[in-house]
Every structure is written in C-alpha cells, then in structure tokens.
Amino acid sequence: MLDVAIIGCGVIGAASAYELSHYRLQTAVFEAENDVADCTTKANSAILHAGYDPEPGTRMARLNVEGSALAKEICARLDVPYRQCGSLVLALSPEELPHLQKLYENGIANGVPGIRLLSAEETLAMEPNLAPNVVGALYAPSAAIVSPWDFALAMAEVAVRNGVELHRSCPVTHIEKTADGWALTTPDGIVETRYIINAAGISAQAVHDMAAPHKFTIQPTRGEYYLLDKSEGSRVHHVIFQCPNENGKGVLVTPTVHGNLLVGPDAVRVEGDNTACTAAGLAFVSTAARRSVPSIRFGESIRNFAGVRANVDTGDFVIGEAEGAPGFIDLAGMKSPGLSSAPAVAKEVTKILKAHGDLPAAKTDYRDGRTRVRFKECSPEEKARLIAENPAYGRVVCRCETITEGEILNALREEIPAATIDGVKRRCGAGMGRCQGGFCGPRVLELISKTLGISPLDVLQDKAGTNVLLCETKQEENHHD
C-alpha cells in the first residue's frame, strides 16, 4: 500500500512529489498525459508573481509570497532558468491611479518586498518603449520569470531519483473508500493508498467528486498568447501588466528566460481542455498589448498557443482535506498565482500529514540538486571538453537554438525521459526557435525512433494521437485501401 498517491503531475503535483520525497514515505504520482507538465503548466505566462494582487488574508496572498521565495531557491538548486526582472503595473489614465494605490496597499499587507509607486517619468525611464500616456506604475522588484515546464520537470526528476514512482499515461478513473484508506482504479490496475493528493488541475473537480460530496466548481478559462522572436526580446525588460479586471491580470507583455517576448493572455470560458487559438482572441490580445507597448512588432510572431487555467468559484485556492473524506487532500483551483505558489502549496500537504501524525522522519540520504548541459552557454573550453568526452555534442541538430545531438540524447535518457518531439523541446529546447522545428524536427523524430526503439510512425508530436507520420510513402496506396 502507498502512503500517498498524487493525482496529476503539473507544477502543483510535481512540487508535492518533490516535497514529500524528502520523507520516508511510499509516494506515487499518476499523470493522465504522457508527460509531466503537459497541460496548464506548459502554457501560461511563466511568471513568479510578487504577490500584490491577491486580497490580504486569502490563501493566495500568503502562499504567493511564500512560494515565490521558495521557487527562487529551488530554481537555483535544480538548475532551472530563472530571472528576477521585476514587474510594472501601468496606469494608463489618471482614473487608474487609485487602483495602483489599492494594489500597493495589498502588497504591503501581503509582505511583498521592495514594492513602490512610480511617477510617469520614473516609469518611462525604466521602460522607454511604453505608451507615452503612462501616468504611473506599481513596481515590484521581486517578480521573476521562469521556465515553468522545466521548473515542474526538475522537481519531478529529483522526486523520482529519491524513490517516488511516476506513472505516465495513467489516468485515475475511479476512487473508492476502503477500511485502510483509498483504492484508485487506473489502467495499471487497482492501487491502494492511505492518502490522496488531488492536484489534477482543470480535472480537480471531477477527481474530488469521485471521492467526496461536491464542494467547488472548476471553470476552465482559456488564454491565448503570441510568442515573438528573440529580435523582439528586449522590447521590454520587466513584466508589464495593465490594471487587472474581473477576468484576471489582463494582457501582459514580458520577456522570457529564453530571450523571446511573450504577449497575452485573454480570458474566455471554455469546456474542458480547449486550447484552440482563434482569430478574435489573438486580435484582442494584440490590440490590448499595444495599449502598453505600441511598438511591438507582431509580424515577428513565431508561434501562437493557448493554455487553460483552472478558475474556481470559491475565489481562492481550495486546499485541505475534503469534508467527509479523511485522507483525501484537495489542491484545487490553482489559477494564477498557482505557479508562483506551488512550493508553498506543497508544504501545506506536509502540514496536514504532520497534524495527523503521519509525517515520518526526513531522509538522511536525500539526493538533491540537478544540472543540465546547455551547450550554447558553455565556454569554448567547456565545449571542447564535452565534444572530446562525447562527439554527439559536436553535432548541432537545432540550428535556431544551437541544440546538439548530445543534448537531445540526454533528454531521451534522463530520469524522466522524453517520449515525444515536444517532450524533447521542453527538456533541451530543440524546436523552440524561429523555425519551430521546421529544420530539426525530422532529425529529432529520427533520434526518438532510434533511441526508444520504436517505429517512426509511432513518434508523437505531443499528446496521444498526434502521430507526426501517417505511413511510409511506398505503402500509401495500401494504407488507403
């Protein structure tokens, strides 16, 4: 029997696995998709928020500030791309200045460090490409940008290294109470566990309702984005927000840790995991973004994408044991600032286990830390050494991002190996550049096929059913028969 079963391996599930892996617990993670961080965690604004937006006294307020500080430490320890660039919330008219004052007061109450109000002159001195009608801004120096999928993957990798089991493509389809805990039905069979952690993202309501009386409603909300080429990456140097509204933090403009410019999102209620991009949504995003940064060149867009966030009708994170379901712990409604809060949310789980007397001693042989080879960032001497040790580092496969065959093979052989083209991209960056895999994609597919010992026809772009190749050319006629 397991001590803890975690349902979902986005950033909340991964952070929970990482936290619990420090203790002598039998823990397993069950992820419905074929990879870690394959839903909301891979498609969001990639920001670790400072913590001035949540209302004081809410879980969001406390966990945002605590989580952002913990995330900074974890990223340094696990070699995750991270940059503390700070954020600006703009007032674009005098009527918006009172809102900045309210956010400032929130920030002071929430313990956000270094927060201050700026004049128009101070704001434009920091960001000359902003709209000239800016009348002021709220500056939060502790805000940061991160690679969200790498953040989740790094925590999951270290958890697996320290004994946590990870089951991919393994959705939980039924939950039943037992005398000793819970029984989960999965494609791998029945799994018994003492505790369940519900970290299922937009599916958290459905998972909760399998085990306990209905308590909350997840309202999936889609946000569409532009990802612009690195030629636009220095258009701004801070995360640029407009004054938020009832739909969220509004359309933002932000640099990324990879050197691009990210613009979005809108906020549209959808059914399920509907990540379609729309002409109307993208038009709204580009028009709204130009209110902040008029000179953005959207002709430099290299990709559009959408993510779905788990808005919830409670207005705050849902954290704790479900009523009438002892041992079933919800971590639900993790909309923004869910990414920022994830490490602190995970610590709430250990507090619950400790309160029950079920948190054992910490491991004395814990193996923390992680490093990644990023060939393009190496010195000439380091590159020469790597190539001498492994000639695969001397073969550049992705020319846009200077990603080598050695890095791709690492992605296919690490503790949580990639199994898809997008899985490789998230681990090492191959296909993330201007041509979006147009050049390197076939070679990446070939390396996946050879390394994993599968047919090229079985190589997926991302989720199940996204096979890149339909058939062998000479068999096309027979295939259609």
Regions found by a protein language model. Name each.
Residues 62-65, 90-99, 138-157, 276-280, ...:
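Short beta-strand to alpha-helix junction loop
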Residues 404-415, 438-456:
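Iron-sulfur (Fe-S) cluster-binding segments and ferredoxin-like electron-carrier domains
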Residues 15, 175-180, 184-264, 268-278, ...:
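Flavin-dependent oxidoreductases
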Residues 2-28:
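N-terminal Rossmann-like FAD-binding beta1-loop-alpha1 element of flavoenzymes
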Residues 46-126, 250-251:
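Dinucleotide-binding Rossmann-like beta1-alpha1 core, especially the glycine-rich loop
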Residues 138-195:
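Helical element adjacent to the flavin cofactor pocket in flavoenzyme catalytic cores
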Residues 248, 257-258, 273-396, 403-416, ...:
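C-terminal catalytic lobe of FAD-dependent flavoproteins
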Residues 22-42:
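Glycine-rich FAD pyrophosphate-binding loop
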